[in-house]
């Protein structure tokens, strides 16, 4: 099974999906979900609506001997806030059993809906090896499944 990245694709239901590269996967995916539903809202606007700016200085936690500073909120919070503030009805599901997760993904994409997925970047075969690390907060869009695997749009990648 392979995973193919796209730039422009016609979905099973006849709609056209256009890939947009984004500064961050979460805001890019959130923007794509709203565009798919007819609300043409940019990634920077999602960042603002979702309160993406955050600052924290943690002198009591050190990495390589230096205190940690952060400039973004926890993964998923921008999406959650933007969806709530824009009045979106969101269905979220978590799966401990990989097969149940794949079965549900296939069920939903067969209806013609695109699906946002959050997963660990380390295991993504399409992701450049130098960027792989254990981080279970990477987001991308699954468009549909074909005979070779899944067609996806990952806003963190150029195409």
Task: Describe the predicted segments one by one.
Residues 2-98:
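Cysteine-nucleophile protease catalytic domains, especially the papain-like/related folds used
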Residues 37-61, 65, 98-149:
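Active-site-adjacent substructure of cysteine-protease-like catalytic cores
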Residues 71-82, 121-131, 152:
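Short, surface-exposed, charge-dense and proline/glycine-enriched linear segments
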Residues 145-159:
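Noncatalytic regulatory segments and standalone regulatory/sensor domains
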């Amino acid at each position: 099974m392979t995973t193919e990245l796209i730039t422009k694709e016609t979905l099973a239901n006849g709609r056209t999906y256009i890939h947009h590269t984004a500064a961050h996967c979460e805001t890019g995916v959130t923007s794509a979900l709203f565009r798919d539903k007819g609300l043409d809202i940019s990634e920077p606007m999602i960042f603002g609506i979702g309160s993406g700016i955050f600052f924290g200085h943690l002198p009591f936690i050190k990495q390589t001997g230096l205190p940690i500073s952060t400039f973004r909120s926890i993964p998923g919070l921008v999406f959650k806030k933007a969806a709530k503030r824009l009045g979106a009805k969101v269905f979220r599901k978590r799966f401990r059993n990989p097969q149940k997760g794949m079965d549900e993904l296939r069920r939903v994409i067969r209806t013609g809906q695109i699906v946002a997925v959050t997963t660990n970047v380390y295991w993504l075969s399409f992701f450049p090896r130098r960027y792989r690390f254990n981080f279970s907060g990477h987001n991308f869009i699954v468009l549909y499944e074909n005979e070779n695997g899944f067609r996806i749009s990952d806003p963190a990648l150029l195409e």
